[in-house]
Amino acid sequence: MAWFRPPPPHTQLRPWVPDAIFIPISRAVERVGVFFYNRVLNKTEVGLFDKRWNKNVHGPYCHWRYYGKLDTKFMDVKLGDLPAWMARREKTPSAFYNEFMRNIWRVHNLYYSGPVYNNTVKVIFRFIFAYSFLNWLVKSHRYVDFQKTMYHW
């Protein structure tokens, strides 16, 4: 385990690749990243806040909140109004992705963080329970024959 010990003070560590090769390559990769950010990512809406969010109206930004115009909830829609309600929905892939991520953040805020952070032990036991339950669900078909023969030894 000598490789695990820290080196003595003032030890000069030599890079694996000579600096004459490593520095120009890393500089080129850095410049390509800057070029990609300036020419491609900067012209998109990736990573920006929702356009409909207004700090003065809504307060601090929340990922799990929908900042669009409020509409009737699906369970409150009458059958006659269903086609009109569906026509008002945005059906682009980005809208589906945004809705999915909003729900991910909402669940994260409700159960794993939020104003009162959960006890670490509670979160660990939640994951243990989820893992155990999923394993039981996947492997339960193995015990069907045993259940049939339980009273017939």
From Swiss-Prot:
It comes from the Eukaryota. GO terms for biological process: proton motive force-driven mitochondrial ATP synthesis; proton transmembrane transport. InterPro entries: F1F0-ATPsyn_F_prd (IPR019344). One of its GO terms (cellular component) is proton-transporting ATP synthase complex. The keyword Transport applies. It is found in: Mitochondrion membrane. Keywords: ATP synthesis, CF(0), Hydrogen ion transport, Ion transport, Membrane, Mitochondrion, Transport. It holds the Pfam family WRW. Subunit of the F-type ATPase which has 2 components, CF(1) - the catalytic core - and CF(0) - the membrane proton channel. Mitochondrial membrane ATP synthase (F(1)F(0) ATP synthase or Complex V) produces ATP from ADP in the presence of a proton gradient across the membrane which is generated by electron transport complexes of the respiratory chain. F-type ATPases consist of two structural domains, F(1) - containing the extramembraneous catalytic core and F(0) - containing the membrane proton channel, linked together by a central stalk and a peripheral stalk. During catalysis, ATP synthesis in the catalytic domain of F(1) is coupled via a rotary mechanism of the central stalk subunits to proton translocation. Belongs to the ATPase F chain family. This is Putative ATP synthase subunit f, mitochondrial. It comes from Caenorhabditis elegans.
